[in-house]
Amino acid sequence: MLEEIKAQLRAHCEVMTALQGELSPAIESAVSLVVDAYRAGNKLLVMGNGGSAADAQHFVAEMVGRFKLERRALPAIALHTDTSILTAIGNDYGFDRIFSRQVEAHAAAGDVVVGISTSGNSPNVQLALELAREKGCRTVALLGKDGGSIKSVAELPLIVPSNDTPRIQEGHITIIHIICDLVERELFLKGN
């Protein structure tokens, strides 16, 4: 058992090393998109399924509440948190439309819409990102494996280089924390 624990920790470290090298420029671009949107008076909309929904909700909580700094709330919406909306849309339009219908209702040009999918193949996330781009939103996708079908839809795909879902999720939450930290610094510590 001890060897398995060490193996999993090594795998985690390998993913973090890959983020530091391969994905750092893309993470910087994601931070810039979010900062620019907030400076322009826009908002952040985030979505995912299962564990990715938990990560999306965490991201939104850090923006609306705070990450590290005492500051004003930043507008952000997690698109999976209202069970009445989800079940109404799912029942009337199908599960694939649960996010796109909300993007239709809430997203405006200049907003940043973030989709999270460890496989990169979640149809409901893909449809929402496609609609968001049509509406003039900036789109970011946190993905894993080979990026799946979503990598070609998102303006900025951030693909965690792993095929192991837990490692991908660890990469996603690390990226989210970096974005939250740097967005706060850019907006509230640099006097902008």
Swiss-Prot record:
What keyword terms does UniProt attach to this protein?
Carbohydrate metabolism, Cytoplasm, Isomerase, Metal-binding, Zinc
Q: What class does this enzyme belong to in the EC scheme? A: isomerase
Q: Would I find Zinc among this entry's keywords? A: yes
At which positions is Zn(2+) bound? 58, 62, 169, 177
Q: Which GO terms describe its cellular component?
A: cytoplasm
Q: What is its main location?
A: cytoplasm
Task: Return the EC number.
Answer: 5.3.1.28
Q: Which residues bind substrate?
A: 49-51, 62, 91-92, 117-119, 122, 169
Protein localization: Cytoplasm
Name the InterPro entries on file.
GmhA/DiaA, Phosphoheptose_Isoase, SIS_dom, SIS_dom_sf, SIS_GmhA/DiaA_subfam
Which Gene3D superfamilies does the UniProt record give?
Glucose-6-phosphate isomerase like protein, domain 1
Q: How is the cofactor bound?
A: Binds 1 zinc ion per subunit.
The yes or no answer to whether the keyword Protein transport is present is no
State whether it acts alone or in a complex, and with which partners, per the record.
Homotetramer.
What this protein is reported to do is described as: Catalyzes the isomerization of sedoheptulose 7-phosphate in D-glycero-D-manno-heptose 7-phosphate.
| Family that this chain belongs to | Belongs to the SIS family. GmhA subfamily.
NCBIfam families with a match to the protein in the record: gmhA (TIGR00441)
Q: What is the name attached to this protein's record? A: Phosphoheptose isomerase
